[in-house]
Every structure is written in structure tokens, then in C-alpha cells.
Amino acid sequence: VHLTAEEKSAVAALWGKVNTDEVGGEALGRLLVVYPWTQRFFDSFGDLSSASAVMSNPKVKAHGKKVFDSFSNGLKHLDNLKGTFASLSELHCDKLHVDPENFKLLGNVLVVVLAHHLGKEFTPQVQSAFQKVVTGVANALAHKYH
């Protein structure tokens, strides 16, 4: 990901204010509600029958935290996202067979959730930087696909 020093600083500063437990669960939950076809990858999560069921599902929250812990780690390695996410890319490609388009959808949902949580601090400049990051992460996760 090609970010200016200013963009890297803004991303790091605002990510430090994010409660990844909360944001991760909310972002994954929103993905499953807004794009219901993504639920097929989460059959073992139990009740995903309604928006309220998804958003209150403890397995969705737990997996969302796991996803965003990995995302947080990626923010420390912006110059090597492909390397950082290589094993996750392989897992999602070879074993889970996740459509790589879903990574882009999740990234866009994350931007919405960050805007909601950060309010006025989520300026257009910060949004632009985060959009570059989520696009870079989505591309890194899609890297192992043929």
C-alpha cells in the first residue's frame, strides 16, 4: 500500500482509538446482514436468521475480533501486506473457498463502521487513507487465488 507519511500517521492514530473487539464484531455482523450470501461461510455460527440475531451472535463477535486482530497486525506491516496475509490468503483460497470479492466488501463495511464510531475525526482525508489500506488488505488476501 502506498501511503504518505501523513496518511500512515493518521491511520495509526485513529486505529489506536478503535475498540477492535467492538468494531470487529460489528463489521463482520454488518457484512453478514448487508450481504447475506456471505453467511454460507459461517454455517457453524448458529442463528443468523435476522439482523438482530446476527448482530448479537457471540460467534460473529468472536470471529470479528479475530479478523480485526489480524487487520491490526497488518497495519504494522503496510509495506508487506502480501507477506503478512500470505497464510490467511492460502487458507481462505484453498480450504475455505471464499470468494475474494468478499474481502473488498468487508473492507468497505469496515470503513462505514469506522465512520460511525469515529464521527468527525473520520475526515475525508482519513477515509481516503483507510480506503487504500482496506483495498491493500483485500488484494493481499486475494493474492493466492488463481
UniProtKB/Swiss-Prot annotation:
Q: Is Cytoplasm a UniProt keyword of this protein? A: no
Where is heme b annotated to bind? Answer: 63, 92
Q: What Gene Ontology cellular component terms go with this record? A: blood microparticle; haptoglobin-hemoglobin complex; hemoglobin complex
Q: Which UniProt keywords apply?
A: Acetylation, Heme, Iron, Metal-binding, Oxygen transport, Phosphoprotein, S-nitrosylation, Transport
Tissue and organ distribution: Red blood cells.
Q: How does it assemble?
A: Heterotetramer of two alpha chains and two beta chains.
Q: What is this protein called?
A: Hemoglobin subunit beta
Question: Which species is the source of this protein?
Answer: Tamias merriami
